[in-house]
Amino acid sequence: MHTRKAITEAIRKLGVQTGDLLMVHASLKAIGPVEGGAETVVAALRSAVGPTGTVMGYASWDRSPYEETLNGARLDDKARRTWPPFDPATAGTYRGFGLLNQFLVQAPGARRSAHPDASMVAVGPLAETLTEPHELGHALGEGSPVERFVRLGGKALLLGAPLNSVTALHYAEAVADIPNKRWVTYEMPMLGRNGEVAWKTASEYDSNGILDCFAIEGKPDAVETIANAYVKLGRHREGVVGFAQCYLFDAQDIVTFGVTYLEKHFGATPIVPAHEAAQRSCEPSG
C-alpha cells in the first residue's frame, strides 16, 4: 500500500520542485493501491510543489455533447432542451482523462475554466491566472490555459499515463505553421449570467488528428509521435511512482520541439515530402 509520503518523495525524485507549475496526467490504476485513494495522490502532488506551486489537470466534462454535435451533427429538439448547461462549479469531469481530475476539482481552492469540452482545473497560487479566460474557439491553442501553462514555465507530469497524453503538445499543433490543418465544429450549451441556456457553436483545430495522416484509427496521432521522438533525445526525466512508469517534461522545451518537428516534416516546404509522410502514416523519417 503506497503512502502519501512515499508518493511525494517519488514525485520529487523525478525532478518536481517546490514552486513548480505542474500539469498532471495520471492513471490511478497504474500507480496501484494508495492509502487514502485518489485524495492522497492529490495531496502528494500538492506537497511536492509546496504552497507556492500549482497543480493543473485536464478535466473536460462528462456531459460534453462534442461527439453528438460534431461537424454539423445535431441533437433532436428534446435533447437540446434537456441537456444540462456547462457550469464549472458543478460539472463532472471526463473519466477518459483520468479519475484524478475529479479529485482536483473537489480540492479546496480549485478553479475551473469555462470551456466545456477543454475545461482545465488548477489548484494553487496560479489557478486563476491559468483558468481565466477560456472561451469557445480557444480550446488548447492561443488564449487557452494550456498556452498560459507553457508560457509560465510549467512541467508536464505523466503518472502512469501514456505518451499520447501530453496535452501541451496540442498547443504545439495549434501554433505550428503547417498547411492543411484539420478543423472541427461543435456546439456546447452555455449558461448565461441570468441562468438562461444558449447553444453556441465553436470552431477549433482537430485535436484528434491535426493532419489527415494523424487521424487514422489505430495509428499514432501527432502528440504520441512527437512525444516518442522527444523522449529519444533524453531531455526529460523518467522514474517510478508507486508502480507507475512516469515521465516529466519541461513544457516549453517539448512544445518548441513539437512545433519544429511539425514544421520540419509537414510545413509548406517540408524536408519530408507530404505524400511520403502520408504513406508512412506520419512516422518520422529519422
Swiss-Prot record:
Enzyme class: transferase
GO biological process, one term: response to antibiotic
The entry's keywords: Acyltransferase, Antibiotic resistance, Plasmid, Transferase
E.C. number: 2.3.1.81
SUPFAM superfamilies xref list: TTHA0583/YokD-like
Keyword Zinc among UniProt keywords: no
Source superkingdom: Bacteria
Classification via InterPro entries: Amioglycoside_AcTrfase, Antibiotic_NAT-like
Reactions this protein catalyses: a 2-deoxystreptamine antibiotic + acetyl-CoA = an N(3)-acetyl-2-deoxystreptamine antibiotic + CoA + H(+)
Annotated signal peptide: none
Stretches of the chain forming a coiled coil according to its record: none
GO molecular function: aminoglycoside 3-N-acetyltransferase activity
Family, as annotated: Belongs to the antibiotic N-acetyltransferase family.
PANTHER family per the UniProt record, alphabetical: AMINOGLYCOSIDE N3-ACETYLTRANSFERASE, SPBETA PROPHAGE-DERIVED AMINOGLYCOSIDE N(3')-ACETYLTRANSFERASE-LIKE PROTEIN YOKD
Annotated function: Resistance to antibiotics containing the 2-deoxy-streptamine ring including gentamicin, kanamycin, tobramycin, neomycin and apramycin.
Protein known as: Aminoglycoside N(3)-acetyltransferase III
Originating species: Salmonella sp
Gene: aacC3
